[in-house]
């Protein structure tokens, strides 16, 4: 507190013993201790009152927002850390996990439906192409005269 070493305190104690005397020295130390205790209590009370006044006026919120504005990297890292911790807490047996599993199953079923639809469309186009080729063959046969046998 006063930045005194052991040797300085020893010298002060010896001087106090000589000046005050051994009879009154314990009473003086007790009085000094009570005074220091009261001073520390008053300092604590003053500090607590100042902190309460700062909290009531919203200074703490302003301080937090200023610190966040000064160092946005920490703010971003805090959100990343919280997201990572949320992912670590993921429980597949929870309602959210069940919904995620249902969503994945629906996505897989949608892909199966799309594949089946594409296959059906390809089969339909193939059938239409075969029918068109057969019709073209019939029309070509009707247009082309039959070959004559020359004997």
Swiss-Prot record:
Alphabetical keyword list: Cell inner membrane, Cell membrane, Membrane, Protein transport, Translocation, Transmembrane, Transmembrane helix, Transport
GO cellular component terms attached to this protein's record: TAT protein transport complex
UniProt biased composition (Basic and acidic residues): 121-130
Keyword Transport: yes
Subcellular location: Cell inner membrane
Residue runs in coiled coils: none
Broad class of the protein's primary localization: membrane
Biased composition (Low complexity): 110-120
Cited Pfam families: TatA_B_E
Record field: transmembrane: 1-21
GO molecular function: protein transmembrane transporter activity
Superkingdom field: Bacteria
Membrane topology field: Single-pass membrane protein
GO biological process, one term: protein transport by the Tat complex
Location of region: Disordered: 102-151
Function description: Part of the twin-arginine translocation (Tat) system that transports large folded proteins containing a characteristic twin-arginine motif in their signal peptide across membranes. Together with TatC, TatB is part of a receptor directly interacting with Tat signal peptides. TatB may form an oligomeric binding site that transiently accommodates folded Tat precursor proteins before their translocation.
NCBIfam families linked: tatB
UniProt record similarity statement: Belongs to the TatB family.
Oligomeric and partner information: The Tat system comprises two distinct complexes: a TatABC complex, containing multiple copies of TatA, TatB and TatC subunits, and a separate TatA complex, containing only TatA subunits. Substrates initially bind to the TatABC complex, which probably triggers association of the separate TatA complex to form the active translocon.
Protein name per UniProt: Sec-independent protein translocase protein TatB
Organism in which the protein naturally occurs: Roseobacter denitrificans (strain ATCC 33942 / OCh 114) (Erythrobacter sp. (strain OCh 114))
């Amino acid at each position: 507190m006063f930045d005194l070493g052991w040797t300085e305190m020893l010298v002060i104690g010896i001087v106090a013993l000589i000046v005050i005397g051994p009879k009154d020295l314990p009473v003086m130390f007790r009085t000094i201790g009570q005074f220091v205790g009261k001073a520390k209590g008053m300092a604590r009370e003053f500090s607590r009152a100042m902190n309460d006044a700062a909290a009531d006026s919203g200074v703490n919120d302003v301080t937090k927002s200023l610190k966040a504005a000064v160092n946005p990297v920490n703010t971003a890292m805090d959100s990343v850390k919280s997201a990572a911790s949320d992912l670590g807490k993921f429980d597949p047996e929870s309602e959210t996990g069940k919904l995620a599993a249902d969503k994945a199953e629906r996505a897989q079923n949608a892909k199966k439906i799309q594949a089946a639809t594409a296959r059906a469309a390809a089969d339909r186009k193939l059938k239409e192409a075969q029918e068109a080729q057969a019709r073209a063959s019939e029309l070509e046969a009707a247009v082309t005269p039959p070959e004559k046998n020359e004997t």
